[in-house]
Amino acid sequence: MPEGARRDLAGLRREYTRAGLAEDGADPDPIRQFGRWFEEALRAGLYEPNAMVLATATPDGRPSARTVLLKGFDERGFVFYTNYGGRKSREIEANPRVALLFYWGELERQVRVEGTAGRTSEEESDAYFATRPRGSQLGAWASRQSEPAESREELERRLAELERRFEGRPVPRPPFWGGYRVRPERIEFWQGRENRLHDRLLYAREGPGWRRVRLQP
């Protein structure tokens, strides 16, 4: 039996004591509240505070999840970029209802987002792709995401071919690569508290605005 399977996990716990989340201290707009917490995560020096778990599902309800990087957010939603041929994209195209999760353990916080994903504009995807390091641009061309690979060497050979192909000129965005924007319908802010009586504030879209409610932990 693996060592980890024999380990007693029942005692792995911690007390949350850092802060609280009260209605009178939270912004009535969830995007502004997210921006406030995101800035605090940046100031705290968290490793990749823009990392978020993206959950998708097939039309028949088979879920899958992976970590992607947030590359922008505003009142329209949360943006990430990916290969349009990979599993996550295929599932989004068939079933655009998705969920996001930000976990900032050092701050004893998490943010959950539920909404609908749609592609960003060609212009927006082009503008972001142009900011990527050249190696990442070439990597986007080299990867046939989620398809089987014969070997690591196969990928390295493809990358070398692309380096020769685009030598001395800008790397354009591949037509099979771009962004998605998740338009939020529900955003929940969770703050760990003592005795597991955590603070949970849920914002639900209601007409042109948002309705906020406190949830029991």
Curated annotation (Swiss-Prot):
Stored PROSITE patterns: PYRIDOX_OXIDASE
Residues that, per the record, bind substrate: 13-16, 71, 128, 132, 136, 196-198
Superkingdom field: Bacteria
Keyword vocabulary terms for this entry: Flavoprotein, FMN, Oxidoreductase, Pyridoxine biosynthesis
EC top class named in words: oxidoreductase
UniProt xrefs under Gene3D superfamilies: Electron Transport, Fmn-binding Protein, Chain A
KW Nucleus (keyword) present: no
Pathway(s) the chain acts in: Cofactor metabolism; pyridoxal 5'-phosphate salvage; pyridoxal 5'-phosphate from pyridoxamine 5'-phosphate: step 1/1; Cofactor metabolism; pyridoxal 5'-phosphate salvage; pyridoxal 5'-phosphate from pyridoxine 5'-phosphate: step 1/1
EC number: 1.4.3.5
Catalytic function, reaction form: pyridoxamine 5'-phosphate + O2 + H2O = pyridoxal 5'-phosphate + H2O2 + NH4(+); pyridoxine 5'-phosphate + O2 = pyridoxal 5'-phosphate + H2O2
Cofactor(s) recorded in Swiss-Prot or TrEMBL: FMN
One Gene Ontology term of the molecular function aspect: pyridoxamine phosphate oxidase activity
Note describing how the cofactor binds: Binds 1 FMN per subunit.
UniProt record, GO biological process: pyridoxine biosynthetic process
Matching Pfam families: PNP_phzG_C, PNPOx_N
List of residues binding FMN: 66-71, 81-82, 87-88, 110, 145-146, 190, 200
Function: Catalyzes the oxidation of either pyridoxine 5'-phosphate (PNP) or pyridoxamine 5'-phosphate (PMP) into pyridoxal 5'-phosphate (PLP).
UniProt family annotation: Belongs to the pyridoxamine 5'-phosphate oxidase family.
Subunit structure: Homodimer.
PANTHER family: PYRIDOXINE-5'-PHOSPHATE OXIDASE, PYRIDOXINE-5-PHOSPHATE OXIDASE
Protein name: Pyridoxine/pyridoxamine 5'-phosphate oxidase
Organism: Rubrobacter xylanophilus (strain DSM 9941 / JCM 11954 / NBRC 16129 / PRD-1)
Lineage: Bacteria, Bacillati, Actinomycetota, Rubrobacteria, Rubrobacterales
